[in-house]
C-alpha cells in the first residue's frame, strides 16, 4: 500500500512547513495554493499527501477512516484531479453541455456543491500551464468567489506560465532541487547503484527521466 506521510518528501523543508501548518489549521488553507519548482522534486506527491491528511476525519492520514479508504482506492468524491495529457490544453467547455474535466463542467457540476464525505473539496491541476487562456479567465472569477469548502491546487514548473492575476491570488509553495545528502537517501531506498550528483542538485538534463519519475513517486 502506498504511504501518504508528508515527511517522506525529502529536501523540501520550506514546502513542508507551509503544508504542516495548514494541516494543523485547515480553516486557514487559502482558496488557491500553487506548488512550483523543477521536475522530480515531489510537487505532486506532496499534494496527494497534503490532501489526504486534510480530508482524513482524524487529520492524520490515518488510513482507516472512510475518507482515507476512499482516497487510497482513488474514489474520493471530494478529490477532483484533472487528467494530465502532455500538450493537451484544458478547455473552458461548451456553453450547452460542457465536457467532463472542462472548466465549465467544474464550475457548474462540482465547484459550488457541498462536499460529500469530507469537510473540504480539493481541485488539483497537475500541470496548470495547460489551462487555456479563456479557461484561466473563467477560473479567475471562480477563485474570487470560491465557496468556503472548495480549495484549488495548481502544480507548475514555472510561475511565469501562469497569469499574474492568478499568481497574485495564491499562496505559492516552493519546491527546490534536492541536495546530495537527500539524493543519496533516495538512491539507497530505490536500489540504484549511482545517481548523477551535480552541484547538489537533481538536474533533469543530467538525470534519466525514469529516475526523476521514481523520485517523484517516492
PLM features: residue spans?
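Charged, glycine-rich active-site and insertion segments that engage polyanionic ligands
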Residues: 1-53, 70, 148-151, 156-218
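Conserved adenine-binding aromatic site and its adjacent loop/helix in ATP-hydrolyzing domains
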Residues: 109, 141, 168
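Short, well-structured alpha-helical patches and their helix-loop capping segments
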Residues: 99, 120, 127, 131-135, ...
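Conserved catalytic/switch belt of AAA+ P-loop NTPases
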Residues: 112, 137-154
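Clamp-loader machinery-focused feature within the broader ASCE/P-loop NTPase space
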Residues: 1-134
